[in-house]
Amino acid sequence: RQLLLDAMQGIADVSGLRFIDRGDNNDDNVELWFYTLDRRDADGSYGFAYTPGSDFDEGLVAINRSMYQTSDFKPKHSIAPGSFYGITFLHELCHAVGLKHPHDSGLKQQPRFPGLTRRSNQYRDSGMFNQNAHPFTQLTYVDKGARNGYVPTAAADHGFLQTLGALDIAALQWLYGINPNASSGRDVYRLPLSNTEGMGWRAIWDTGGIDRIDGSLAEMPVTIDLRNATLGQDDAAGGYPSSAEGVFGGFTIAHDWNGVDLTESAGLCIIEHATGGRAGDRLIGNQASNRLRGRRGDDVLYGGLGGKDRLVGGPGRDQFWIEAVSGSFATVRDFQPELDQLVFDVPRESLSLSSQADDLLIQWRDIPIALLKGVDSLDWSSQVLFSGFQGL
């Protein structure tokens, strides 16, 4: 029951859909029904649901109890959030409110996921750009068969989606509109740091406050990417994963839009800050004004396109990737000339330097793009690379 309640809350948190508990009343206003079945009635499936418009059973959600409990009601498998079996409840509820599998054509011959056909292997084929898989959508059957390095290759008690994926969120918002008031405070999203029961992936839909993804307790390298899912024909359609190395779990960030126009940012779902840990981390910003703090280790910090970013590498040999574009400005607060490097994706001759009190201003074609605090000179040969941004 709690998993179904959590599933309903998860859908309401991101969309305009709301659920009202009418108890056991059997009347025409009831849109969703929940049942438990045994193995014989469920035909061996984990569960099933009837989508709107199917027949008189539309809105029915059935869970095969025998897949989860023994005959004396003892648990067979973990159903903790993030477990292989735990996602069934959210998966089936999504069907009941109108979402289909990416690999099939639904009731009315809707398009399959890009790159899939009726001959595709529904358990292994992740489609175009490998996005038909966890952690990008929980409606897929490509979970432990994804082999993408983000999720386990067996039915584990951790490592899979705990929530809707970014692609699921977009589909629900297209149907029901967005929830513009979700997580509107100052939120901190802490990276999971171990492969233990109940850990897994979450897609963030956060519409307010100054927020941060935090990996400060990590002993292993972390990647924190503040960019939103693109929903485009690319390998970031379902999001840019943020996680600790070797851990199956972390975050993606849902597409930032108003539920109507995919091509324009609504400025709602924005995560502003990132904090690394004690190893060599990779921190990537977005179009907002970001504060990126690498802490220990040899870190890479990239403020992204747009905004006034503040970059702090911390101890170690750090790289600061500086975007040369109008409207984007990075302040590097702790550049260590004997250790650190700047990286640009433009030619050396397009850049110039000028002193500003105790700081050094960097300009691209006379447009200010960066300020090095407490630095009075720069050695172009040893402290600067013009290799571009590899791996973005």
What does each model-found stretch correspond to?
Residues 229, 233-307:
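Extracellular repeat-rich scaffold modules on cell surfaces
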Residues 163, 250-251, 260, 268, ...:
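Low-complexity acidic/polar repeat-biased segments
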Residues 35, 64, 140, 205, ...:
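Residue-level detector of conserved, well-ordered beta-strand and adjacent loop positions
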Residues 155-199, 208, 212, 216-231, ...:
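Extracytoplasmic and endomembrane cell-envelope/extracellular-matrix remodeling and assembly machinery
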Residues 74-84, 107-125, 131, 143-167, ...:
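Acidic, glycine-rich calcium-binding repeat modules characteristic of RTX/beta-roll
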Residues 2-150, 156, 208-212, 216-254:
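Metzincin-family zinc-dependent endopeptidase catalytic domain
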Residues 38-41, 68, 99-103, 144-146, ...:
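Acidic glycine-/aspartate-rich tracts in secreted/extracellular proteins
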